[in-house]
Regions:
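Gram-negative bacterial Sec-dependent N-terminal signal peptides
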Residues: 1-27
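Secretion/assembly modules of Gram-negative surface proteins
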Residues: 26-28, 45, 78-86, 115-124, ...
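Extracellular/periplasmic catalytic domains that process cell-envelope and extracellular macromolecules
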Residues: 27-29, 84-88, 121-126, 130, ...
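Structural recognition of the beta-strand scaffold that forms the well-ordered cores
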Residues: 32-47, 71-74, 90-96, 128-134, ...
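Conserved SGNH/GDSL esterase-like catalytic core that processes O-acyl groups on lipids
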Residues: 56-165, 313-317
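A structural motif corresponding to the C-terminal end of an alpha-helix
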Residues: 74, 78-79, 123, 169-183, ...
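Outer-membrane beta-barrel translocator domains and adjoining extracellular loop/strand segments
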Residues: 143-146, 196-199, 351-355
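Mobile gating loops/cap/lid regions near enzyme active sites that modulate substrate access
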Residues: 189, 194-207, 211, 218-222, ...
Length: 356
């Protein structure tokens, strides 16, 4: 039966619930990782393609759009870059900084990333884990014109709709091709990113991001119902960011509003910042994102133990963030997820390519 897992910020996690569900967990296993996306997932593809020109490294870390590895490099696989002639039988990363969700030529849009993978002989298996994350660059590039129009929200709406449609096309195509598990990230709060925070563009950026997330979710629910052989996991990065911003100290952070790297100088304590630059997380931020992603990927079936109202199950438990030194005070912000099955239905104003 198809499973659609959606992170959700449910209130009041209790230790009793955590213990009850933790004992019922059964770990998931995957044979390899295939990645499609933009700078949040890029492990150095754009850097290699531009001859080391973008992003500037250092201060960026070895071609990543951060000061350390991207979260996709922390999911238990050593995925290779998508250079010409690269093997597509093992783990591989096709994400490019600056990529849109469409068929843009360069950086390769995500539709083109998928075409490049399948064109090289790449296939999808029931044991594969596929990560898909994108949409922000479409919005970044659409904001200037939309902001200058008489109806900014109306002008940005087609950009948002097209990006969400691209994402859902990718998910549906990959599921139809046989992928067992697809991790689909939505986009974080754009209005609260340093690039937009406090600017006149912030409200429109936030509107665009949240509208995209809503459209993405609606499409994924339809796709999950139509693709019973694939587990589709919506990784709610928006709510991850909200949890970190609401209680930064619980996660070892002291600054969740400013960029550590301002384009000239790097802050003294990058590991205490959430943002590396105007829109990208620090290595510490990527590590926190990866910890929660791993929790859902490897223990994502816990919700099945608690069915509530027809085909909906709610999961309340402690996420394994390995933050014991921080105590329990902030962990509830990470907790919970909503697990949906479909038996009842079916039986920021620049691209990240330049390093900001």
């Amino acid at each position: 039966m198809s499973r659609f897992l959606r992170n959700a910020a449910l209130a009041a996690l209790t230790m009793a619930a955590a213990g009850a569900f933790a004992s019922a967990a059964s770990a998931q296993t995957y044979s390899r990782l295939v990645v499609f996306g933009d700078s949040l997932s890029d492990n150095g593809n754009l850097f290699a393609a531009t001859g080391g020109a973008s992003p500037t490294s250092p201060p960026y870390f070895q071609g990543r759009f951060s000061n350390g590895p991207a979260f996709t490099e922390l999911l238990g696989f050593n995925a290779g870059r998508s250079a010409a002639g690269a093997s597509v039988t093992g783990s591989i990363n096709y994400a490019y900084g600056g990529a849109r969700t469409d068929s843009s030529a360069f950086p390769p849009g995500m539709r083109n990333q998928l075409l490049a993978y399948t064109g090289a002989g790449g296939t999808f298996r029931s044991t594969d884990l596929v990560s898909i994350l994108g949409g922000a660059n479409n919005i970044f590039q659409g904001l200037p014109a939309a902001g200058a129009s008489p109806n900014p929200t109306g002008a940005i709406a087609p950009v948002v709709s097209a990006a969400a449609a691209d994402m859902n096309f990718l998910v549906n195509s990959i599921a139809a091709a046989g992928a067992g598990t697809i991790l689909v990230g939505n986009i974080p709060s754009l209005g609260n990113a340093p690039q937009f925070r406090g600017t006149v563009a912030a409200p429109l950026a936030e509107f665009a991001g949240t509208s995209f997330n809503s459209a993405l979710l609606a499409g994924l629910m339809t796709t999950a119902a139509a693709r019973p052989g694939t587990n589709i996991i919506l990784f709610d990065i928006y709510k991850v960011g909200a949890a970190l911003t609401a209680n930064p100290g619980a996660f070892g952070l002291t600054n969740v509003t400013d960029a550590c790297f301002n384009g000239i100088t790097v802050c003294a304590t990058p590991n205490t910042y959430l943002f590396w630059d105007g829109v990208h997380p620090t290595a510490a931020g990527h590590q926190l994102i990866a910890r929660l992603a791993n929790d859902y990927l490897y223990y994502g079936d816990i919700g099945a133990q608690s069915t509530v109202q027809a085909e909906t199950a709610f999961r309340q438990r402690e996420d394994l963030l390995d933050l014991a030194s921080e105590g329990m005070s902030g962990r509830a912000d990470w907790q919970a997820g909503t697990h949906l099955t479909f038996g009842a239905i079916a039986d920021s104003v620049e691209t990240d390519a330049r390093g900001s």
